[in-house]
């Protein structure tokens, strides 16, 4: 019993455990004093029964308990403090430790083993660990001591020493096998001892310091994770900044190399210094052209034909927000959809050296080739006739005008190229050809009425945009079926702005050079050169008549008075409107498969558009709304009977223009056109027999009509 006082001294030993945490192994040495305390712990053994349920393998613990003392250190997490006490017994490697091992062999001996619990310090572990499992934790107090070793042991935790703990020396290392110590708690059932020594509760505080060491390990792991996340975020940010910087520098470099669009002509915006840049650029192109032919020499061409100095029929379609061409030297940012320049090398490579196999069509303007850019995008490359003043004017008009506009029903220019005398325009390729091809091409299936109406509405909207939404307004001057491209969904795209004119808001433009296509020209423009947006309206009316009747604008088989579609249709339009008998004018190929209300709207629009006096014609936005059914066809008449130019109640003709004068001018046009017999005698193609042409004196005496030759199956030229 005298030993009892020593237990009292045991509290002092707890301090020793404190230093032990740093040196994990030293801990076993300090425990020697505690052995005396072992007996006191014996009384509490019975209560520990609660702990045993936690661990099913009691038998193994019995053997292990003696040795676990050291092992408990790993268990700190487990809270089976009972074993820890035993560790102290092993620590006194003196003879006592051997004695303790024997008792562990029998589970019943736990009471004997309880002496090991004397380590009141064991309670210390409870504090380090979670209070919720107090029962087990008390037994684990010793583990707290061991926690300090864990840092070193972590490397070996996998070692199965738990069973070997029988040797006291091993205990320090045994910490890794905390799993084994857990069973000991049952055997010792020493869990009660911790409660028995409440005073030890204070000592646990010291062990608590050791457990603290384990949390740092976890926190360090958390910190390492956080650091990794932070590094990843920081790295991503730095990468984004670097990419942005590279993009900015590249863009800046491109701008330096930019070429301004060609010099303006007839009010087309853009500066004139482009010519110097163009010549310098062409020099570079000559040196870099991979194909055998350099830009200075024209690419291979088909045989020549008579030139008309007119706009061709071709232009490609450009869908909404379409993909831009791949970056190229001199890439420039322009207005609208227009994006920039191409070099001759790119276009030569895209068209396979401007090979004849890639030729889509040819006309007075030059040639059109199909090409494919490096990004796989199909394009149509229009090569304007070299050395032609008309070709240069068309080039300036297209670059200056098309680059300013963007509408889903207007063809947009993708880019252009200037190389020496070469002038090339690049459009997105449209594989479904033109309205003329589908309406008049030989062997073509009959176009359904729904498709015809859809094309009429789309092209009307495109023209309305040019007339109403562009400032200043743009007059196309060459509206015809072959200049309306369609995609596979039969959406219309108005093309070919080579003859387009920027109109003045105040004065009617009077041209000394009448240009357009025979059969589509407005009478006032053909006879006097007076050009307004209503000239486009007349031409569009002719296109509507083609959609309704399926006829061409000029009947080549009738060289007499009524060979014009307009002259034939005008008298019938009034009859159709009064009687509602559309069979007189409707295309027989439709077999009456059409909506009568929609047909009535289109007939009314066509009649209003082809009125002989320009002021009596409707605006294109009105035409588009009537075709869509948004307003009544009667809104187009304004007191005018369809097919006539006179106002109701008026005894005379229109005061704006003399219809007889217009008719006389048109008769002159017919005479000149029909005198050019080769226009009709030579087979140009199975469609598009009516080319654009021009008159140089404002009348028709000097005009020439020539054919735009097109390859079969293609709607370009």
Curated annotation (Swiss-Prot):
Extracellular topological intervals: 1-228
Keyword Ubl conjugation part of the UniProt annotation: no
UniProt xrefs under Gene3D superfamilies: Phosphorylase Kinase, domain 1 (3.30.200.20), Transferase(Phosphotransferase) domain 1 (1.10.510.10)
EC number: 2.7.11.1
SUPFAM superfamilies noted in UniProt: Protein kinase-like (PK-like)
Region of interest (Disordered), ranges: 1-221, 258-323, 632-665, 690-717
Enzyme class (EC, first level): transferase
Record localization: Cell membrane
Expression sites by tissue: Mostly expressed in inflorescence bolt, flower buds and siliques, and, to a lower extent, in roots, seedlings and leaves.
Compositionally biased tracts (Polar residues): 632-644, 692-705
Entry GO CC: plasma membrane
Short name of any one Pfam family annotated for the protein: PK_Tyr_Ser-Thr
Residue ranges of domain Protein kinase in the record: 354-631
UniProt-recorded name of the protein: Proline-rich receptor-like protein kinase PERK2
